[in-house]
Amino acid sequence: MTERELAEAIEVIPERLYWVALHTAPKNTLKSHYFSIDDELLYEPFFADFGPLSLSLTYRYCKLLEAKLNDAAVSEKRIIHYCGHDSKNRANAAYLICAYQVVVMGKLAEAAYEPFCGIYPPFLAFRDATCGICSYKCTIMDCLKGLEYGIQYRWFDYNCFDVDTCEFFEKVENGDMNWVAPGKFLAFAGPSATSTDNDGFPAFTPEDYVPLFKEAAIRLVVRLNRKQYDRQRFIDQGIKHVDLYFLDGSCPPNDIINKFFHICENEPGAIGVHCKAGLGRTGTLIGLYAMKHFRFPARAFIGWNRICRPGSILGPQQQYLCDMEVDMFQAGAVMGKIPHPFMAADLEKALALQVEKLSVRDGPNHGDQFEDVGQGERLCNAKRHATLRGVDVLSPNLQQHQSRNATPPQLGTFPIGASGRTDGGRGVVNRLSGNATNWKPQDPLSRQTSPSGGVANGGAKSLRGIFG
């Protein structure tokens, strides 16, 4: 890297950390140490989407960069994160180095991104996971603000995050589930009535989820898609179940919003929410709740949701959440700064008026009049096919490095920011007591029918242990 190229690099930490896009891979020098993650931390696309990189990959990057900055062997060198000029790689690389500043250095999103303001060419905005044209632009700043809010509400704690367990449960063969608001909302793919789906691919049944949900204090399941299993299979195992169906790929009608709020505000335990793929309808309703109860801005929530569960919130649902932001903030303000878990009749009426007002203002572009038929099934198929291809978000080299240095995931504490509370994440840390569920990773070609047996790395896997 020439002095001219260094002059064009973005200085993140004065005289120490830099970011730059280069046409060719540079060699280390006496003064500079270079590294790239373009071929190491990989986004797994559904269709034309390419980022942002997931929470687990964000965490791994932060650990990687932190180690380099603390490495005595390069303590006198400039650390330079370089990427190629591919627009997708540039966006993901810039997101990561900014995320490091938010997560590890404690900077606000605006301060972290400030060195990149005015960069040319501008960064490519992230898009949704639909097949068609995407008019909504999810920016790097949206994602950084999402991280900032997630940390503020203690939904993510860098010091106690269990990355191995997070990556385990987000795999299709291990349940396809992610915490969006840890301890309050878990998003997951719709359970199957049988242990294999129509294509013969291994699938999770209600009975597979039950022991995991019980261990994680998930006491209620909300189904948003058409019936594909008997809800009694959850109820008989002591987990409540509610149906709130609305059209695939659509935005929720007013009555669904009101029912969802009433149910969730009266449920002290954690809630598992799913549609077909657990991405669009699921993320949209959780987003409305987050705006109302946590004043989580819509654009930031979309960024956060996609970091937690890639592919979430699609098509018209994106702009819909933005249009609902003011109304949800107002609805939350009616309930007070610290929302009470039970809605009085007058508060329910006030919320209904807010939602109705928006519905009249927006006309036919929102609500349940739009349906993307088969969207959920397409998304599920994309994930299944990636699993069959053996796609992994870590490169082979990094997989070997992680396996050599990995320690077995352990149960511990996790932030109470959403443990049945609606106080914006304030509270003490709660220690999990109880037995972990041993869970064997699912072999796509060999179905494991019961949650028993040791995991690959010898540690017990716990949904509740992901965040500490």
Predicted regions and their residues:
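Acidic/glycine-enriched edge-of-secondary-structure segments
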Residues: 25, 35-59, 186-198, 245
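Short, solvent-exposed polar/charged micro-motifs at secondary-structure junctions
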Residues: 27-30, 253
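Fold-level signal for large, globular catalytic cores of enzyme and receptor domains
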Residues: 174-183, 188-195, 200-247, 251-273, ...
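Conserved G/P- and acidic residue-centered "switch" motifs that form tight phosphate/ATP-binding loops
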Residues: 278
